[in-house]
């Protein structure tokens, strides 16, 4: 057991986690040169296309150290984006140490800090590594000082390497063996295994990635899932050397996968504990704190026949992505669908793309909203995650919106731009500290603004140098209103948005103008109105198409023309009463982009 090392690789986006993982696999001979590919752990098509890691992946390697001993390294490659921070915290729970990879050109960025603090809170040994030293812009000495100054870890002897060229990777492996402690646990104690991750395989059922804390698991053992009390037999058990390899036993401290033929998606939830059915342990391991979704949006299948498939797809996906939340919802305009909760906009995009690709669905998304706390006049407090659930205006005492604490790291040249952006987003400055050339600014910004396009705007206003990390802070009273969209006097529930009173006029106007572009002309006028309660704040009209009825009159009396025009007018009026307006998919997408330009 003292030859096992469990560690995660954490870093900011694009500091070279996945490339470093590739090198470690190559040096330890996990894959032959023929099977080796760039970013071999990013197995999803979506990950390769966007060049980001979405799912944490685990690998077991054997490494023969300089002292002649063979060590078993279990490591987990983690994502860097804020939206997938839940993946990171789960991966860290399975380790004793973490490699903090820092780009020697870019230096410390916001996610570096956030992930590092998560690791330190979990009592892990954090080992700093300076990557990309082959770049002409690299300045490892300055970055080592930065790490010490901003993060507070001694980085003077930090290992320097270049994952791309393979320079210094051997030193990294030696550092891992020396600095990261061996797992603790009792091989004789009753078995306890923590489920770190699980996914659904069409042939095997639920596959779970587990970390054995005490005891061991063997093939054909009878095991019990602690939260449900169900008993299963282990069919197959093994490790990843990125390839799935079967073994007969997983010992204390190891990380591996288990297949028990569980067909029910909720059979082995992430964060649960497995133990032996007979003589098992009494206590569950402390799992992970549940994350609260920050953004909610309605997802509806385009054709209502897909509803069943959509429900199954969401179930399978939520097994793989524990931070996804969903509940059924129905809308007058869109039929049956689900209200889904996500950790951020990127997460929402990724989930939607995965549903459309992996499960072959066509989906419509409604405008994303955050959760508001609403105090009613009778003292009741509601949590509202969709504009449709907001009570009537005269029942509301106050609406409180969620405020996010944003930690922004930015070079001092771009500080002005960033402050301007934060003020425009109704932010309040909390703190500002200078660390050499970098400035750490802390703002409290309403979550609704952060979620919409804060990240993109921050990147563009600072030429990509600013980095952001945010988390939910508190609810704060604010004058929020619901803007409804009416088509010919009928409310369309799926188009409503909740916005701040100051922005409501402009948002309403933008909304109706955008909608006007997308609704095709009909035989009668279509009035598109934005309203707050009964008060109309903006209107635009899609003009009717009309036939020239007096073209056939040649000369003749004016009363003849009047008669024809009047007849046409009455016909249009009748049409307007019974006609209904078809909303194209683009009209819904238009709403997503209101307020972005």
Curated annotation (Swiss-Prot):
Tell me a GO biological process for this protein: positive regulation of translation
GO MF term (any one): ribosome binding
EC number(s)? 3.6.5.n1
One Pfam entry for this protein is: LepA_C
Reply yes or no: does the keyword Nucleotide-binding apply: yes
Q: Which InterPro entries match?
A: EF-4, EFG_III/V, EFG_V-like, EFTu-like_2, G_TR_CS, LepA_C_sf, LepA_CTD, LepA_IV
Q: Which residues bind GTP?
A: 14-19, 131-134
Lineage, top-rank taxon, reads: Bacteria
Protein's membrane topology: Peripheral membrane protein
Keywords recorded for this protein, A-Z: Cell inner membrane, Cell membrane, GTP-binding, Hydrolase, Membrane, Nucleotide-binding, Protein biosynthesis
Q: Which GO terms describe its cellular component?
A: plasma membrane
Q: Which SMART domains does the record cross-reference, listed alphabetically?
A: EFG_C (SM00838)
Top-rank EC class of the record's enzyme:
hydrolase
**UniProt domain tr-type G: residue ranges:** 2-184
Gene3D superfamilies on file: 3.30.70.240, Elongation factor 4, C-terminal domain (3.30.70.2570), Elongation Factor G (Translational Gtpase), domain 3 (3.30.70.870), P-loop containing nucleotide triphosphate hydrolases (3.40.50.300), Translation factors (2.40.30.10)
Q: Where in the cell is it found?
A: Cell inner membrane
Asked whether the keyword Nucleotide-binding is assigned, the reply is yes
Q: List the disulfide bonds.
A: none
What is the catalytic activity of this protein? GTP + H2O = GDP + phosphate + H(+)
**What's its job?**
Required for accurate and efficient protein synthesis under certain stress conditions. May act as a fidelity factor of the translation reaction, by catalyzing a one-codon backward translocation of tRNAs on improperly translocated ribosomes. Back-translocation proceeds from a post-translocation (POST) complex to a pre-translocation (PRE) complex, thus giving elongation factor G a second chance to translocate the tRNAs correctly. Binds to ribosomes in a GTP-dependent manner.
Q: Which family does it belong to?
A: Belongs to the TRAFAC class translation factor GTPase superfamily. Classic translation factor GTPase family. LepA subfamily.
**Stored HAMAP family:** LepA
Which protein are we looking at?
Elongation factor 4
Q: What is this organism's lineage? A: Bacteria, Pseudomonadati, Pseudomonadota, Gammaproteobacteria, Vibrionales
